[in-house]
Structures are given as structure tokens and as C-alpha cells.
């Protein structure tokens, strides 16, 4: 059964939470689980921003199909190649074979090594400061290497001033139906896990100055 959240007039959360996983990346204890965040933009073109880990693939594909409502998927934006963002990318391409993939050159090269589909036939490459228009919404792309892998980029919706930030502001912890800041007490519910996430994953990958 689908479980989605309408974020704005035309943006939907289609991710999922995993409360069964004991260790994130087989290293970090996650007693409160973890969430995988993916979004769909329904503009003149349809856009999927990231996929999810294989562990929640069933929920994700139900969510995606529900939000698309029979529309084709035109674009997939890949911000980061870690499995919690991209493990289901190949299956998404199989289900939506006409979708183009918006990424950068490093992500394209990693896709060549990780997956079997022809990325070169569908890749639209972004570099620092490039923009892409989907209709009402225009996205700008900013490279964010080592946050926390070398290929990472982020998307900024110039229309709504929304940042899709990959892992930059991540935290451990499953989402219990609340996605907006005024629905949670961040300092009570998330700040400790956000600090642990930053110190475990982001801080250790910062480039040496």
C-alpha cells in the first residue's frame, strides 16, 4: 500500500523508512531505524529525485507509481551513488525505460561500473552552476564532492528555493509520518542522531585543508 506525502503543490515524498536494519552500512548501530528520502516533481515533465535502498524497494515502487498516476517518468536525478540513494536505480530504469538520467560525469562513470544498463544513451550531464528546466521549475546544480563521496551533487529549485541536499543534512532515524519542521521537536527527537550521523559519515570524509 502506498505511503506518500504531498510536500508542495507539485512535489511529493515517495521514500520509505526501514525499522528492521540493525547496522547502517554494516557498521553504525541504528536502534531507531533509518529513512530513505526520494521525491517526485510533477511539472510539465515528471522528475524523480533519487531512489532508495533495496530493502524498501517494494514500498518505493508503489509510492512512485501512485504519485505518477499513469504519467511516464521523464527524468531521474541522481545526486549520490551510495546504495541508500541509488540501489534501486537499475530497477527504476527497467520499469521506466524512457527516463533520462540527470547526473554529473563522476556519477555517470560510477553507474557504468555499478549497473548493466546503458547510461551513455540516457545521461544528461550537469556541471557546476548548470541549470535544467522541467516546465515551471528550473533546477540549478552544485557539485558537493566528499559530502560524503567524491561524486555528490545537489539540486536547487530556483522556483521554490528548495534544496535537495543529498547527505549534507542527513540523520539516522526512521520517519514516523512527520516530514515538516513544525511537526517534530528536532532537539528532542533528532539532534543526537544528526550529530552522530555527521561525525560518523560526513565529517570523516571532509577534504584535508
For each predicted feature, which ranges?
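Residue-level detector of conserved catalytic or cofactor/ligand-binding positions
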Residues: 202-209
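Metallo-beta-lactamase
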Residues: 5-9, 102-152
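Active-site environment of divalent metal-dependent phosphoester hydrolases
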Residues: 21, 81-86, 108-111, 148-150, ...
